[in-house]
Amino acid sequence: MKRHLARNAKAGVPPTRPLLACAAWSFVLLYGCAGRPTGVLEPVAANPSAAQVEMLVTTTRSRAEKPGEMFSGERALSPTFAEMTVSIPPDTVRKAGEVAWPSKLPPNPETDFATLKAVEVDRGAAEKWLNTHVRKSPDGSVLVFIHGFNNHFEDAVFRFAQIIHDSGARSVPVLATWPSRGSLLAYGYDRESTNYTRNAVERLLQYLARDPEVKEVSILAHSMGNWLALESLRQMAIRNDGLPAKFRNVMLAAPDVDVDVFGSQIADMGKQRPRFTLFVSRDDRALAVSRRVWGNVSRLGAIDPEQSPYKEELAANGITVVDLTKIKAGDNLHHTKFAESPEIVRLIGSRLCSGQTLTDSRLGLGDHIVAATAGAAHTVGTAAGLVVAAPAAIVDQNTRRNYVHHVEALAEPSGATR
């Protein structure tokens, strides 16, 4: 976009410690604290009644010291790779969109998500894994998932496994995970960790672009992970003078991104770019908090796509918008609507995997989903089937922990440095 989406917005300012503390307590007040066991990535024996999802992981996280955690929220000097297999309990004990976290260890594969394989591998083994799985896939497609703010490593692994399973996606799953501390007060650290990871994600995308076995690449990002996805694509486009044709779909779920900066990022990618699908909800309270942190500049995931200047700019750039404001979700922050709506997971996921467009009237969702890009229906594409299960671990009441750290951080003087 040559013109910024929000012309009248004030320039964003870096979040200060008091603002971050205020934002964090907003999350805490909206969501209660519920614990769960740590070390859930310790492998267990498979159960024949459970489904399995295999994925390749690339991460800039440091190795964890505790068994069963694998990777921490600290930053590594170079990317690391891993092969993961996740067991998912039968649909009779879990509804689509849910991550069934174990209440105790070891997990029971009949009722819980469980880890069957968690092995760190070198780059050569990772490339071999990818090549083998792409050759086995029906269409040679790869899906890269980038999680959002406040995610531990296991959050990202289990959520991505849920997305792949519930959507019925045929793409080869590749998880790109960055050093999030999984703390509500680590917003600034997490944001800088996405910047820290840009080069690693770009290298992943460059490899997929060069690999002749990979026929199609789709990217699904959630919340703060959208910043990392957009920056990596922008960086790649500038370096390569455009993006490859095999990069078909980029799906931005509840993006915690400044609307002005998004306009600049899209413009920098040039005219040859993937199809972008934007999932917004105007009642997203998590993004409302983020907006206050960033100087009251609108966040991309909370815009009204029918209002100017968004409507005109989105239409001019062929960006599909799916407005989920009317979807009733189970979470207080309305930031988890994809994960909380099993009907959308099943219905839209199956349609997209079958090659139908997201705005196809045959979906029959009536007024519950408004797909609008200046009234035009734009094609989303075949490999976008997993969009419907966009992750939401940022506010998952069953995944929050380490509140002693939160209290200690709030108790520090506002001028303290580390």
Enumerate the language-model features and the residues they cover.
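Gly/Ala-rich beta-loop-alpha elbow adjacent to hydrolase catalytic centers
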Residues: 221, 225, 229
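The conserved beta1-alpha1 loop
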Residues: 144-148
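C-terminal motif of bacterial Sec signal peptides marking the signal peptidase cleavage site
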Residues: 30-32
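N-terminal secretory signal peptides that target proteins for export/translocation
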Residues: 1-15
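Alpha/beta-hydrolase fold active-site loops
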Residues: 141
